[in-house]
């Protein structure tokens, strides 16, 4: 009989304890494991040394590390995925990629993305020519010339208009990486090279080449770009902006190499 009374009373005690804990603000799930953070799918394309894939398949570079830090501060985990630019943009348009630390103001992405407030870095798109050759007048001196490009990159409308201008009759030569692009220019296999300054400088130093003269065509600001089709897109971009500000105001160094 005593055991039956205990069995009947214990559930009542449990309910009383639960009610008391709720009134006092004690977490009722204190013994439960903490909820895992949401994982954001982060897309990028190879842009060493800012962001690139190492030999183990891990995203490295200062832009990748900054993305990890800010996302962690905002309460998110990250899963990086390297993609060619066309597939990356398509994934942002579909929502299979949540976040891209990349170029602000891409017209083809405007309807499908939200942009963070803070400029993480900025990069220059330059037209390079060999030392000892005259700087070209743009666009007239490009007529009939050969232009080296990196395959998989996309450009802004003003650059695309230049490349597609039938009156210039440009011969476009595509290669897979910055090292081979510089080698092509050095060996007179192309008249000019259209490329971004940060990876060109890294490749030039690896090849021990002299500095190349260039003309800046475009300066590109880098921001957090969030797919509008990601779940809670506005909350993501707001959270990343707030996290960046929290880290900055705490005195953390958030600076990245810029051209």
Describe the predicted segments one by one.
Residues 15-26:
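Bacterial N-terminal signal peptides
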Residues 33-111, 174:
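Extracytoplasmic small-molecule ligand-binding "clamshell" domains
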Residues 38-52, 139-155:
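Short loop->beta-strand "edge-of-pocket" segments that line small-molecule binding or catalytic clefts
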Residues 44-47, 122-126, 206-244:
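Periplasmic-binding protein-like
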Residues 68, 80-141, 155, 213-216:
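Acidic, polar ligand-binding/catalytic clefts
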């Amino acid at each position: 009989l005593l055991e039956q009374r205990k069995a009947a009373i214990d559930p009542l005690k449990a309910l009383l304890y639960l009610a008391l804990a709720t009134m006092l603000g004690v977490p009722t799930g204190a013994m439960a494991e903490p909820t895992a953070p949401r994982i954001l799918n982060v897309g990028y394309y190879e842009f060493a040394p800012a962001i690139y894939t190492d030999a183990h398949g891990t995203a490295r570079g200062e832009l990748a590390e900054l993305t990890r830090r800010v996302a962690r501060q905002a309460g998110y985990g990250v899963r990086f995925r390297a993609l060619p630019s066309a597939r990356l943009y398509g994934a942002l348009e579909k929502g299979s990629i949540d976040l891209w630390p990349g170029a602000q103001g891409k017209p083809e992405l405007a309807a499908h993305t939200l942009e963070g407030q803070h400029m993480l870095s900025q990069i220059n798109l330059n037209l390079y020519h060999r030392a000892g050759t005259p700087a070209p007048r743009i666009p007239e001196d490009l007529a009939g010339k050969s232009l080296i490009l990196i395959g998989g990159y996309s450009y802004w409308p003003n650059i695309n208009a230049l490349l597609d201008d039938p009156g210039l009759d440009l011969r476009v030569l595509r290669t897979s990486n910055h090292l081979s692009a510089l080698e092509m220019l050095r060996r007179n296999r192309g008249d000019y090279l259209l490329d971004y300054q940060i990876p060109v400088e890294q490749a030039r130093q690896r090849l021990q080449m002299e500095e190349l003269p260039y003309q800046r065509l475009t300066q590109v600001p880098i921001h957090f770009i969030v797919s509008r089709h990601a779940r809670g897109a506005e909350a993501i971009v707001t959270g990343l902006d707030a996290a960046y500000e929290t880290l900055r105001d705490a005195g953390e160094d958030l600076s990245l190499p810029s051209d």
